[in-house]
Regions:
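Cofactor-/ligand-binding subdomain signature composed of acidic, glycine-rich
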Residues: 1-49, 53
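Gly-rich Lys/Arg/Thr-decorated short loops/hinges at beta-loop-alpha junctions or inter-strand turns
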Residues: 17, 38-46, 106-117, 229, ...
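Charged, alpha-helix-enriched surfaces in structured cytosolic catalytic cores
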Residues: 30, 55, 59, 124, ...
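A short, well-structured juxtamembrane/interface segment
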Residues: 52-67
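Helix N-cap / loop-to-helix initiation motif
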Residues: 53, 139, 152, 257-258, ...
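Glycine-rich phosphate-binding loops that contact phosphosugars or nucleotide phosphates
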Residues: 75-213, 221-223
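Short, amphipathic alpha-helical interaction segments embedded in low-complexity terminal/linker regions
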Residues: 216, 221-311
Length: 311
């Protein structure tokens, strides 16, 4: 028997992420290929929904960069799938962009245990968000991004509200419009992807949308901070065999130098690819490369220009 529709008054209170599409009530009766085709078809709408928020995402990137240039941090706060996606993005910044410890932070309602198992009720406790953020001792140069598919998760909303009282920049990322989360934040990104094929399972389209937005946000922020050279991850520091191979490829691609020159530069710079590129292109020693990068806030193009002026 198909599920009965909700009463009209109850349905109006539900965010779109919790809505039930009657035409999908029989997915458990579908052939497997038809089921995955339906899900894949719905997934195609997600990039289009994200594209509708690119101006807001770009504005957020520029605002975050302004603060991180002054030493601020980027902090994600969420519960369940949304919080795990924030933690994932934060954890990928050090190996990709050589960010400093604590420069990008992921807060998850319920703590590390909630990464691998549900911590019942954690998302409904705003006091947990306050405790997590108070431990960080926020400053006006920090940015707190509350992430919630419905836009009404108490943990995420409380995180943004508290962060705003400290003067930190606040951003609300929701998958519905007119949410409490976005209303509480200084900047809002509303990626409305519509009901899920499996009603209320926001690890699907909503989770994909959140991952895409955070990919855009953190990557664009790091590009603007000079963590790349063109589209190369030059802030990589080689600490194992795989990373040493990658560092060699990056330096070779950036400089056009032969293998022997690349390896010599990486050895001199203790495996720091950005420094090694500067050693080769500016024809300087490793200490000089380090000084040029420090004077250029780590931006390789500016360090190269500075080396030319000093030559």
């Amino acid at each position: 028997m198909d599920p009965e529709p909700l009463p009209e008054a109850k349905r109006e209170r539900l965010p779109v992420t919790e809505a039930v599409r009657p035409e999908w009530a029989g997915i458990d009766l579908m052939a497997t290929l038809d089921l995955v085709r339906l899900m894949n078809s719905e997934d195609r709408s997600v990039p289009e929904a994200v594209a509708g928020q690119l101006e807001q995402i770009a504005a957020a990137v520029d605002a975050v960069v302004t603060r991180m240039t002054r030493g601020g941090r980027l902090v994600y706060a969420g519960a369940g799938t949304a919080g795990r996606i924030g933690v994932l993005d934060a954890s990928e910044c050090p190996p990709t962009f050589n960010t400093a410890p604590g420069q990008v932070v992921g807060l998850l309602a319920g703590g590390p245990q909630a990464l691998v198992s549900a911590v019942e009720g954690a998302e409904d406790r705003p006091e947990l968000a306050l405790a997590d953020l108070e431990e960080l001792k926020l400053t006006p140069d920090d940015t707190v991004v509350g992430i919630s598919a419905s836009g009404r998760t108490p943990y995420a909303v409380a995180a943004v509200r508290h962060a705003r009282t400290t003067g930190a920049l606040t951003l609300g990322l929701a998958c519905t419009r007119g949410s409490d989360l976005v209303a509480a934040a200084a900047l809002g990104i509303e990626v409305e992807v519509g009901p899920e094929v499996l009603a209320g399972s926001t690890r699907l389209k909503a989770g994909t949308a959140q991952k895409l937005v955070l990919n855009l946000l953190s990557t664009a922020v790091m590009v603007r901070l000079g963590k790349t050279y063109g589209n190369l991850m030059v802030d990589l520091r080689a600490g194992n065999e795989k990373l040493r191979d990658r560092a060699e490829r990056i330096v070779a691609q950036a400089t056009g130098a032969d293998e022997k020159t690349v390896r010599r530069a990486l050895t001199a710079t203790d495996g720091r690819a950005k420094d090694a590129v500067l050693v080769v292109l500016a024809d300087v020693d490793a200490p000089t490369a380090a000084r040029l990068l420090a004077a250029s806030d780590g931006r390789l193009r500016e360090a190269l220009a500075l080396s030319t002026r000093k030559a």
